[in-house]
Amino acid sequence: MGLFSLKKQIAEAAAKSAAAAPKSNLPPEKESLYEAMVQTLLKESKTSMGMMGKSSTKAAVQLLYPNEIPKYAILTNVSLGSLAAGDVFTPKGFKNKTNVVLIITDERLLFAGALGTPIEKVIPLEEICVIDDSNITSVIHSVLRVEDAETILAIDGNKQVLGAFCAELKKAVRKRKSRT
């Protein structure tokens, strides 16, 4: 999906959802853009096995967070030793192990795939965490700051790990809400 097509779909979806009430503390115009992006990317994930090209990945980050630098990125099933400068995602995944990167800011959690581009060129990283089935829970509780499970944007990847991650995330969100 090219950058032009992505922007066109986002604009169309944003126009339709502009009247919807915001579900978070984001400004209404940003909330409608976010909701449009969610719907666009979820639709895309069902038609292209969830893998996005570098242009649409950059567009997703820049349109949602034009003034923010993502604080964390989590790469699933990737050893830290493979994250040398210039490492790239390939059509088979990052070093043939994964095609999913979780982009986290203070407000939102995004899932996005990036193909054929050095990851440091797509996402400025302050910290990298690696998750697998054994440490999903500890990563969620120590790193993620997500107030609303509805903010999850899930692009298909490693379904077993991604499914477990989402389940744990929702549990963590419910526990946090019950304490407030």
Q: What are the residue ranges of the model-derived segments?
A:
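Phosphoinositide-binding peripheral membrane targeting modules
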Residues: 81-143, 147-150
